[in-house]
């Protein structure tokens, strides 16, 4: 990562002035700092059963859960795993752990048993908070390793019920000293290459990131206590956890929780609760654009539609503008390691700026961005494409137990290299044009080719394999495999797909298999994915 520093860096900043950020505060103290102004207002609305928790309720329940976790043996710097869909309990567990100076690692409840256990093991989780239907995925691992399982619905044999946490006395929270650099969240990300790694996000980092979005006289993302935010994106993903939950808590907005996206409930909830802020991802935007039912609902309350996690095309933008007549539509750009927000659309500001279609915002305030030539390491002026780099208090502390991967991602001067290629135009707007990194983006979810390749190579009838993205209208990208059969093997496409689908979550399943004589590689043995992508683009895989 050490690049030749021949010239002075060309650094880009927000059009908004820097602000004071109280990032000495622990995350929970910061989020609830102004709670006296809205303690009786709705904080969480459970879309599934219409239950409403006020800000006072959420703070109290989170404190009770903190005391309960302490009673179950959780100490500062210990980790709990939250293996849940969006739910009030997810919120109470996450904030409860923060009160103790403990860490939450969030996992997708749809993960296979192997994927969940891998993350539980890597993060050294002491407690797993989940639902009864997922207990079988972790039961053997938990019992062998003295890990407690706490269920939010019914508790199968050997598991505890979430009420052991919520019935604790909130005054029993121990006094703990939380340092700004202590880790509070540990999402897993594949980074720019390779297998999923624990991303250490600190109290200071998340406080800074939330403040960069919603604090200040002219916040970049203007949300207030009269707003209703739709939380349909999964909270185990940092975009939803940060830009929906934490930002919403900080400003006193109502957060309407949906367990999973389905278009009818989605439209009904927007109409019933007069949702004003819609943080979406392109697949949801596509569903809105394509559904004839949208016209039967009143969506006029929505004033902001944010899209993140993957680029949104111009046609899609125009269609959505027509469906949400009163909404400003814009994009943000994030990466888990960056805390996660790097850039955000300034049309969302309290005093908005004009924006361009296709841009993903301008760099957030209190941060610095530069565009670097991947070959020379020199920073580039406006309108020249290079690797996007970000620096500021919001970025990750590093990867858990992986100093090498950390050093490859963050240089000695504190610059985080994103692996994304983009440029900044004359109006400070950021455009993303390509990815250096190898990740496949399926509906905003990361798929690491290396993970699938390792599984493919375990098959006795496969001698070599490479996985690359293929464009897909609905998902954005899907994984496809190029496979070299072992001597004399007659393994079929369906057999390969079936072999993988048993081992991974749905979005990592291989959609096509192309059999080849050899995988193209560089002299150092690196797979030349560029060549394989070019083959796909030319329509000549075999």
UniProtKB/Swiss-Prot annotation:
Record note on what altering residue 441 to A does: Abolished activity against 4-coumarate
Pfam families (alphabetical): AMP-binding, AMP-binding_C
Residues where (E)-4-coumaroyl-AMP binds: 239, 243, 309, 332, 336, 344, 420, 435, 437, 441
Catalyses which reaction(s): (E)-4-coumarate + ATP + CoA = (E)-4-coumaroyl-CoA + AMP + diphosphate; (E)-caffeate + ATP + CoA = (E)-caffeoyl-CoA + AMP + diphosphate; (E)-ferulate + ATP + CoA = (E)-feruloyl-CoA + AMP + diphosphate; (E)-cinnamate + ATP + CoA = (E)-cinnamoyl-CoA + AMP + diphosphate
Sites where the protein binds (E)-caffeoyl-AMP: 239, 243, 309, 332, 336, 344, 420, 435, 437, 441
Keywords (A to Z) from UniProt: ATP-binding, Ligase, Magnesium, Nucleotide-binding, Phenylpropanoid metabolism
Keyword Magnesium in annotation: yes
Known outcome of mutating residue 526 to A: Abolished activity against 4-coumarate
Region (SBD2): 332-399
GO BP: phenylpropanoid metabolic process; response to jasmonic acid; response to wounding
Pathway: Phytoalexin biosynthesis; 3,4',5-trihydroxystilbene biosynthesis; 3,4',5-trihydroxystilbene from trans-4-coumarate: step 1/2
CDD domains recorded: 4CL
Residues noted as binding CoA in the record, renumbered to the chain: 260, 443-444
Binding positions for ATP per the UniProt entry: 189-193, 197, 331-332, 336, 420, 435, 526
GO molecular function: (E)-caffeate-CoA ligase activity; 4-coumarate-CoA ligase activity; ATP binding; CoA-ligase activity; trans-cinnamate-CoA ligase activity; trans-feruloyl-CoA synthase activity
Outcome recorded upon mutating residue 239 to F: Reduced activity against 4-coumarate
Binding-site list for AMP: 332, 336, 420, 437, 441, 446
The protein's enzyme class: ligase
Induction section of the entry: Induced by wounding and methyl jasmonate (MeJA).
Coiled coil stretches, renumbered: none
Annotated binding of (E)-feruloyl-AMP, by residue: 239, 243, 309, 332, 336, 344, 420, 435, 437, 441
Stretch list, region SBD1: 262-331
Record's function text: Major enzyme of the phenylpropanoid pathway that mediates the production of several precursors for numerous metabolites and regulates carbon flow. Catalyzes the formation of CoA thioesters using 4-coumarate, ferulate, caffeate, and cinnamate as substrates. Follows a two-step reaction mechanism, wherein a (hydroxy)cinnamate substrate first undergoes adenylation by ATP leading to an acyl-AMP, followed by a thioesterification in the presence of CoA to yield the final (hydroxy)cinnamoyl-CoA product. Almost inactive toward sinapate.
Domain description: Both substrate-binding domains (SBD1 and SBD2) are involved in the substrate recognition, and are sufficient to confer the substrate specificity.
Protein name per the record: 4-coumarate--CoA ligase 2
Organism in which the protein naturally occurs: Nicotiana tabacum
